[in-house]
Each structure stands twice: as structure tokens, then as C-alpha cells.
């Protein structure tokens, strides 16, 4: 058999093997058999070393024709097998688009966040903006500027979390209320001001109605001619809007170092309609917030003239209002991450 005939026979053998491949694995085996490092076609190129010089050109042409025929057949079969494999996979993965979609489980808005958003929304409708401040406060912003004297009980260690002193001087605390935001805003801006400041506050207390960390909303308004009647109307409107019902509201004289005059605000008990029950301790009233006209000394501390400007301030516990509106009995459940509680009270 001549060299030419041997190469033609090898070509037919390779093409036949390629055509007989039923899957990509079979085709890969054929490639290794003929074109691998020790493959039948690969070994034919070794003939060039022993071939007489005058025959090398012709032998080279035959080998190139063999390789080209092999490659054309191999690529065509490879493309065909890939298409066949894709088609088979698509058939096996075919979806029934008439089936209902899978339910996606989503988280909900925590009742504290929900209450803050609802409170902020009500006050936004009254022209108030939202401000924030640091939770680690200076003694001055948390107490001194708010006219809270050095001997006031609120400054005691059993009520306040004191932390490392400020390197620049002065004591630092975890803020006990969001009123320091009022001081910071009034120090840096001029009236007219309408601001609420929701945020976390910290006190050394823990029982059914108290936790060491809770949320508070401080609000204040400063302008010329501000009076207590405006404060009263504002808070009555807020409570009726937030609780979505017209409730009797009363203002009781009280005392806060940073307001004068000061008042505690009560509303008729939601659970007994003012008739008296366990929740309101038989009084028919529920205490919901404190308020008053900003004390002249506080105005002085922030550089405002109390002869020109007047203002009022109010503060409320977010969890307290949330407990009343959403019917929650224990303040501590807000922070225990009980999925059953969150599923019942979260908004999705």
C-alpha cells in the first residue's frame, strides 16, 4: 500500500469515527484517538523526518489535506452534538407557565419603625421637618443647656449612663432624651423653626413599661408670637390624627426644667373609653406626653433673645404610643425579636 493510500484510509477511518460519535464524550475520545499527543494522525507527521527530501513537499500536502478533512468533519459533528445536547436539556427543563408562582417571603416594618414613620408623617403635614443628632452627647447638650441643674436627680448614675470623659473636657453620656437635638438646631439656625427629632435614648431602667434603650420624639417650634394655645391645638390635632379618632385630651400642670409653663398631656383611655379599667388604673385617662413653653434660660443658652422669640417643646415615647395604638401590653416585647410578635404587628 502506497503512503498516499494509507493516509486516505486513515482519513476515512477518522471521519467514520467522528460521524459515529453519539455525544460529546464520544467525540472527545475520537479526538484523543486521532489528534491527541499519541494520536494516529499526529504520529503521521513523524514521517517528515524520514521522508526523502524530494518527497517532503508532496507528503506535507497530503498530511495537510488529511488534517483539514478531519477538522471540518470534527467541527461539524461538534456543533451538531452541542445543539442536540442543548435541545435535550431544554426539553427536560421545560416549565409549565400555567403553574402559580412561588410565594416570596418578605420582611415587615418593625412596629417601632412603623410608629416613628406615622408620627413623622403627621407632623410633616403640619410643616415640621425631621432632624437628628448624636446618641453620645456632652453633659452640656444633654443637661446644662436644658436648664437641668447639677443636683437634679436625672443626673444621678442610677438614671443616666455615663461614659468616658471627653478628651477636650466635659463629661459624656448616652443621651437620656432627644432634647439635645433641639439645642443643636437652635444653636446653629435662626427662627422660624419647626422641627421633630425622633431617635434612641438611654436610661438605667428596666421593667414592664421601661427598657434601658427606647425611642423618643422631641418636637419644638420657635418664632415670634408663639403661645401655649398653639401648642395645645397642635398636640390635640396630632393625637386625634395618630390614633384615628377624636379623643378627649386634657393638659395637667407639671414641671420640667426646660419649659415654663409645663404640662403633662393625657387622653381618654382607648380601652375603656374613659370609664376606668386596669390599663388606665381606673382613672379613665392615659398619660401620653409632656410639653411646655421653652424656658427663657434655654433660649439664653442657645443665644436667642426670649424678648423677641418664643417657642414650645414637647416629647413623647414612641413605644408608649405604639403600645396604645397597636394593643401591645409589654414594652419589652418590642426588643425581644420574637417572630410571632413581629409577624402579628409588623406591616408588610
UniProtKB/Swiss-Prot annotation:
Lineage top rank: taxon: Bacteria
InterPro entries, sorted: aa-tRNA-synth_II, aa-tRNA-synth_II/BPL/LPL, Phe-tRNA-synth_IIc_asu, Phe-tRNA_ligase_II_N, Phe_tRNA_ligase_alpha1_bac, Phenylalanyl-tRNA_Synthase, tRNA-bd_arm
Enzyme class: ligase
GO cellular component, one term: cytoplasm
PROSITE patterns named in the record: AA_TRNA_LIGASE_II
EC number: 6.1.1.20
Annotated Pfam families: Phe_tRNA-synt_N (PF02912), tRNA-synt_2d (PF01409)
GO biological-process terms attached to the record: phenylalanyl-tRNA aminoacylation
Substrates-to-products reaction catalysed: tRNA(Phe) + L-phenylalanine + ATP = L-phenylalanyl-tRNA(Phe) + AMP + diphosphate + H(+)
KW Thylakoid (keyword) present: no
Cofactor binding remark: Binds 2 magnesium ions per tetramer.
GO molecular function: ATP binding; magnesium ion binding; phenylalanine-tRNA ligase activity; tRNA binding
Residues binding Mg(2+), per UniProt: 260
Subcellular location: Cytoplasm
Transmembrane segments annotated in the record for this chain: none
Subunit structure: Tetramer of two alpha and two beta subunits.
Family statement: Belongs to the class-II aminoacyl-tRNA synthetase family. Phe-tRNA synthetase alpha subunit type 1 subfamily.
Record's protein name: Phenylalanine--tRNA ligase alpha subunit
The gene coding this protein: pheS
Amino acid at each position: 500500500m502506497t503512503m498516499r493510500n494509507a493516509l486516505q484510509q486513515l482519513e476515512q477511518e477518522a471521519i467514520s469515527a467522528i460521524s459515529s460519535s453519539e455525544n460529546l464524550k464520544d467525540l472527545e475520545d475520537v479526538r484523543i484517538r486521532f489528534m491527541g499527543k499519541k494520536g494516529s494522525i499526529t504520529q503521521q507527521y513523524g514521517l517528515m523526518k524520514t521522508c526523502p527530501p524530494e518527497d517532503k513537499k508532496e507528503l506535507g500536502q497530503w498530511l495537510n489535506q488529511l488534517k483539514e478533512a478531519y477538522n471540518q468533519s470534527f467541527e461539524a459533528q461538534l456543533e451538531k452534538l452541542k445543539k442536540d445536547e442543548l435541545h435535550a436539556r431544554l426539553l427536560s427543563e421545560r416549565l409549565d407557565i400555567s403553574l402559580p408562582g412561588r410565594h416570596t417571603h418578605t420582611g415587615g416594618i418593625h412596629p417601632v419603625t412603623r410608629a416613628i414613620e406615622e408620627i413623622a408623617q403627621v407632623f410633616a403635614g403640619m410643616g415640621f421637618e425631621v432632624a437628628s443628632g448624636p446618641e453620645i452627647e456632652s453633659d452640656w447638650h444633654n443637661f446644662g443647656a436644658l436648664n437641668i441643674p447639677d443636683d437634679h436627680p436625672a443626673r444621678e448614675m442610677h438614671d443616666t449612663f455615663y461614659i468616658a470623659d471627653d478628651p477636650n473636657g466635659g463629661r459624656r453620656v448616652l443621651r437620656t432624651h432627644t432634647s439635645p437635638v433641639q439645642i443643636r438646631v437652635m444653636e446653629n439656625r435662626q427662627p422660624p423653626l419647626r422641627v421633630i427629632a425622633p431617635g434612641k435614648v438611654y436610661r438605667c431602667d428596666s421593667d414592664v413599661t421601661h427598657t434601658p434603650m427606647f425611642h423618643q420624639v422631641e418636637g419644638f417650634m420657635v418664632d415670634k408670637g408663639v403661645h401655649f394655645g398653639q401648642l395645645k391645638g397642635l398636640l390635640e390635632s396630632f393625637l386625634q390624627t395618630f390614633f384615628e379618632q377624636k379623643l378627649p385630651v386634657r393638659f395637667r400642670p407639671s414641671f420640667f426644667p426646660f419649659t415654663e409653663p409645663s404640662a403633662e398631656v393625657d387622653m381618654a383611655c382607648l380601652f375603656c373609653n374613659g370609664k376606668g379599667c386596669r390599663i388606665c388604673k381606673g382613672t379613665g385617662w392615659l398619660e401620653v406626653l409632656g410639653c411646655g413653653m421653652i424656658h427663657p434660660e434655654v433660649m439664653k443658652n442657645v443665644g436667642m433673645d426670649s424678648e423677641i422669640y418664643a417657642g414650645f417643646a414637647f416629647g413623647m415615647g414612641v413605644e408608649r404610643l405604639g403600645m396604645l395604638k397597636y394593643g401591645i401590653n409589654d414594652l419589652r416585647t418590642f426588643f425581644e425579636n420574637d417572630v410571632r410578635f413581629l409577624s402579628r404587628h409588623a406591616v408588610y
